[in-house]
Every structure is written in C-alpha cells, then in structure tokens.
Amino acid sequence: MSVLLIEAFYGGSHKQLMDLINQEIEGCVLYTLPAKKWHWRARTAALYFMQAILPDDKYRVLFTSSVLNLAELAVLRPDLGKLKKILYFHENQLIYPVQKTQERDFQYGYNQILSCLVADIVVFNSAFNMESFLTSIKTFLKKIPDHRPKNLEEIIRPKCCVLYFPMTFPDISQFLPEHKRVSHTLADNMSSMDISHCPKTSLQAENMSVEFSHDQIQSSIGESSAEQERATISEKNICASGDPVILNASNTLAGDIRQKKPLHIVWPHRWEHDKDPETFFKVLLKLKEKELTFHVSVLGETFTDVPDIFSEARITLGSSVLHWGYLASKDDYLQALCMADVVVSTAKHEFFGVAMLEAVHCGCYPLCPKSLVYPEIFPAVYLYSSPEQLYRKLENFCKRPDVVRRHRFQGDTARFSWAALRGEFRSLLAAEPREDL
C-alpha cells in the first residue's frame, strides 16, 4: 500500500481513471467524494480529506485530480505534504467559458495554480490542456488588482508533462448492427498492430512535443495498410466543404439496405452550457425545417442546472428522438452508441473527449469543432470550422446515410488505450520515496 488516490469529484472520466488505476496498479488506496456540486468540491474538499484520510506511513505517492486544492491539503496534513505529489488535469479553469463572470470564479483557477506550485509532477490529459493552461497563467493573474506574482509559468512548466487519458475499449460485438461488423473487425485488427510507432507521451516536459498535425496522426496507420486501403476503397465527395468521405467497398451489404433507415445522430455529452447544446439543437432544427429525415439520441449526464434549450428541443424534435437522457447502464449506453451513425461535439470546453472516442469505438463517424483538443485527437476530415459547415455535413449525411455507414474511421485510437499507456502510468506512480520520509 504505497499510492494514495484522491478524487474530489468521483464521476465521469474522473471516476474512470481512478477506478482503472486502483484496479491495475498494485498498492493503491482510494478516497473519494461524490460527483455533485462541483463548485463546493473545489472549495472545500481539502478540509474533508484532511479528516477522512487515515494516517499511514506506507504511503509514498499521492495522486489526485486538479479539482482538489492540493496546496490546502498539503498544509492541513503535513504527512501527506511530504509525499511525491502528482496532480492530474482533466480540464483547466483558466479558460473555462463562464456565462457570466463573477469574482468568485477566479478562485477555481487560482486554486489550480496553487496546486501546481506544491505538486512534484503536473500531468495533463492532452497537449492542448497543458499549453492552454500554462500560457493563460499570466493573463489570468492580471485580474488581481495589484502586487501580482511573477514568472509562475516558468516555475510550473518544468514539472509538466502530457499523459493521455487511458481508454478501456470494451467488447461491443454483441451490440453492433450488421453493417458495422466488418468495419469494426478491420479496425480491431489495426488496433492490435504494434503500437511502438504511436506518438510517445513523456514524463519529461522538455521532451514533449505539443504539435500534432493531421499527417502525423494519419502516418500511424502505416504505409502497407494504406496501399491495401487504396486498392479497396472509392471516394465520394458529398461534403459541401470538400472533405472526402472514404468508403469501404469491401463491405458487401446492399446499398439500399444502408439507405433505408434515417441517419442516426448521437450527442453523448454533459447537459451543460460549456458543451454548447444551443448550437447542436439549432443545427438539428434547421435540418428539420428543411424536411430532412433523421433520428437523434441525446445522452450524457445531467446536473443541478440544465439549460432550458433541452426541454425546448425535446418538444420541437418530437418523433425524431430515439433516446433522451442519461443511460445509467454501461451496456445500454454502448448499445445506443452502436446503433448511431454520427457522433457530434459542439463543445466550447474540451480537453480530451472520452465520449467522442467511445462513440468512435462503437463505429460512429465523428464531427468535432476544428479547435480545442480535437485537432490533436482526430484527423482533419472529421473537423468542422463553423456551425454552418456542421449543418452542411449533416445535411449531406441525411441525404446519403449509406455513405456514413460504409465509412471506416481513418485515425488511430490505439494510442489512447490503457494497453498503450499502462507502462507510463506505472512509471509515474512507482516514484522513489523522498529522502525526508
């Protein structure tokens, strides 16, 4: 028992990561708070954990997400402050798109900066997350009226590294409709290839490249598979933007079968304003006004304040809705993703995108903003630059759903798997004990 895991917001991807580490890494002890009232967790969790965590001289490493004010806990519990402290950023508050700025909102980003200063290693789930945080520190601190601290980026940056969120891709074969099975088998074969060619995440910040081009991501597929693909596919340009949609001609299901069912769009995100549901529903309502046929599943968790647009859109979309609301059963959730054709993100605040990668694993065609973390994760063909371009892509897919159903994902999800990242997490959490313990 040497690794102390602390999660102040034990839900969603935060829960997934802690559960995975707790299951896969020996000697872990996990302390959590439920994923409710995020703002209160960020303000007060340190005081709770000060009392809840039992003293134990076997602890050598403390691993926590950035929801916790690590600086407070380190002072309140000097025994924990002496541990090797690792801070993991799922998201950062320095660029959070608040609807109405209030002075108290400053505290959340400020807490994260303080936590970085006391941490020994600061880990981000993407290069975008790391760079957006570090380069925003100076601007963020300008909100302080006077006597501002200096050079904090230079102090924090040497501690920083990128270690992607480790995905566990479950067996979904039982949920796949017939037209997805061939493509998914091919994708599985590609995922099982040697992953030594994948972009290397590094625990040394100075070795971390933060530029991920479309060509770099595409190159991970390999030349031999690309040659085979060129021999077995045809391309049809049905996107108004000019982006090619690649068809898998080896799949022999009849085109008229693919064309029968309306396009099924899924939106599997938190029901909160930072995921920009307004843009998503405006695009869908425009499709409906044009009398285009489609089905939609709106999944994802809900919290205390649900934007009004959800209740309004539910009424307006009417019979187009197949699923509406959070699916607590993981199997039900995966089945809903497997039945969908296209997964859409309209997020204004995203640093990795677990839900999008889960949907891609289930055979969905991803459509993401050409911003935030998405260019780091997805090839350019899956990115859109504006709501109008998103509308045009969905309009064309509504007219030709068979094109989407023939498509095979052109990226590489294997580099985000636990199998690819296990070694780096083990190295991170197997740090040598400090001499002063």
Swiss-Prot record:
The keyword Amino-acid biosynthesis does not apply. It comes from the Eukaryota. SUPFAM superfamilies: UDP-Glycosyltransferase/glycogen phosphorylase. GO terms for cellular component: cytoplasm; nucleus. It catalyses: queuosine(34) in tRNA(Asp) + GDP-alpha-D-mannose = O-4''-alpha-D-mannosylqueuosine(34) in tRNA(Asp) + GDP + H(+). GO terms for biological process: central nervous system development; regulation of translation; tRNA modification. This is tRNA-queuosine alpha-mannosyltransferase. The lineage of its organism: Eukaryota, Metazoa, Chordata, Craniata, Vertebrata.
